[in-house]
C-alpha cells in the first residue's frame, strides 16, 4: 500500500540502549532493532540497502532550504546535480574534500537530504507516499505526506491541569466537541463523498477557531489548527487510519517481551527477536496460526503459502491504496511488501 504506520520504543541489546522500530499496516508488522532513532535510521528501515546511496538533486536542495548554509556551500552543492547517485564512501569523501569547514549540524543535514532524495529517486523501490505517525521530528521529510494520529493530538488537552472550575468546564466541553468531530471523520471513512469532505474541512476550521479565554487551552487549539493539513489527510484518502494504535500495539508487544526477557545479548539475538516478532504478528493479522506456520517450515511440509503471497492477495481485496489509483509508484494494492517473507 502507499501508506504505512510507524512507531518506535526503547530496547536494550547487551545492556546498551537501542531503539526498536515498527512498520506496519493491516496486513503485517515488521520489527527492526537499530542503535538510534534519528531520521537517517528511520530511512534505513524504510529503505534498507547494503550500502546507502546519495543524490544531490533538486529535491535535496529544497530540503536544505530548511537550514542556513553559506552561499558558497550552496554553489558547491549545485555542481553535484549532474551526479545521479553516489555510494556512501565516494559521497562522504567528496563532501569532506570540497566542504571541509561544514559544521557537524550542516554536514548531517546534507547527508540526510541527499539520502532521502536517493530514496525517492529509486525507480525500483516501492516508495511510501504517506506515513501515519506521531509528531516526532524524525518522521518528517521522509515521505511526500504524513498523517498525525488523532489520539496523540487529543492527549495534550487531557493533560491540561486547570486549577479553576470554569477552566475545567471549558476543557471538558472542548474535548467533547473534539471527539464528536473525530467520530464524524470515522463515519466519513465508511461512505466518503465530496460534499461531506468539504463540510468536514469547514467544520475543522470552525472547531479550532474556538477562543475560550483559558490561555493554555487556546494555545493547544491554535497548535492543532496549524496541523490541519496533516490531520485531515483522511479526507483525500479515506483508507488512512485516524489513529496509530496498530503500530503502538505492535510496539507494546516488544515492551512486554523486553519486560520478560530483558533483552538480547548480541546483534544476532536482536535480529532473531525482530524476525520472530515480525512473523508472529504478521501471521496473526493474516489469520494464520504462528505455531502451525513455524511447524510447516521446520518440517519442510510447505503447505502454508508464503506470508508475502498472502499479503499480496489480501491487499488486492482490501484496496488499501484505492484512493491513490493504481498507476503511481507504490500505489498498487498488489505490490509486494518488501519486508515480508
Protein language model regions, located:
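Catalytic center-proximal scaffold of phosphoryl-transfer enzymes
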Residues: 1-341
Amino acid at each position: 500500500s502507499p501508506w504505512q504506520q510507524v512507531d518506535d520504543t526503547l530496547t536494550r541489546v547487551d545492556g546498551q540502549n537501542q531503539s526498536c522500530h515498527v512498520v506496519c499496516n493491516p496486513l503485517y508488522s515488521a520489527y527492526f532493532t537499530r542503535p538510534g532513532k534519528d531520521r537517517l535510521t528511520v530511512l534505513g528501515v524504510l529503505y534498507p540497502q547494503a550500502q546507502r546511496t546519495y543524490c544531490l538533486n533538486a529535491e535535496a536542495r529544497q530540503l536544505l532550504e530548511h537550514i542556513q548554509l553559506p552561499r558558497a556551500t550552496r554553489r558547491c552543492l549545485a555542481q553535484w546535480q549532474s551526479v545521479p547517485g553516489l555510494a556512501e564512501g565516494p559521497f562522504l569523501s567528496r563532501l569532506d574534500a570540497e566542504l571541509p569547514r561544514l559544521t557537524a549540524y550542516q554536514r548531517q543535514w546534507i547527508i540526510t537530504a541527499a539520502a532521502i532524495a536517493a530514496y525517492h529517486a529509486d525507480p525500483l523501490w516501492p516508495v511510501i507516499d504517506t506515513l501515519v505517525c506521531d509528531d516526532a521530528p524524525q518522521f518528517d521529510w521522509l515521505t511526500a505526506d504524513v498523517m498525525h494520529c488523532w489520539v496523540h493530538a487529543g492527549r495534550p488537552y487531557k493533560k491540561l491541569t486547570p486549577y479553576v472550575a470554569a477552566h475545567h468546564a471549558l476543557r471538558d466541553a472542548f474535548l467533547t466537541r473534539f471527539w464528536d468531530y473525530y467520530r464524524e471523520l470515522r463515519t466519513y471513512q465508511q461512505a466518503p463523498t465530496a460534499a461531506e469532505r468539504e463540510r468536514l474541512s469547514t467544520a475543522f476550521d470552525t472547531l479550532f477557531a474556538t477562543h475560550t479565554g483559558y490561555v493554555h487551552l487556546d494555545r493547544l487549539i491554535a497548535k492543532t489548527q496549524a496541523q490541519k493539513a496533516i490531520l485531515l489527510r483522511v479526507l483525500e484518502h479515506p483508507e488512512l487510519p485516524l489513529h496509530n494504535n496498530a503500530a503502538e500495539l505492535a510496539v507494546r508487544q516488544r515492551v512486554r517481551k523486553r519486560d520478560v526477557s530483558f533483552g538480547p545479548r548480541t546483534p544476532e539475538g536482536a535480529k532473531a527477536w525482530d524476525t520472530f516478532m515480525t512473523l508472529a504478528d504478521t501471521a496473526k493479522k493474516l489469520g494464520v496460526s504462528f505455531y502451525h506456520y513455524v511447524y510447516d517450515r521446520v518440517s519442510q511440509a510447505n503447505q502454508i503459502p508464503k506470508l508475502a503471497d498472502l499479503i499480496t492477495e489480501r491487499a488486492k481485496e482490501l484496496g488499501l491504496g484505492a484512493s491513490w489509483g493504481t498507476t503511481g509508484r507504490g500505489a498498487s494494492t498488489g505490490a509486494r511488501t518488501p519486508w515480508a517473507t
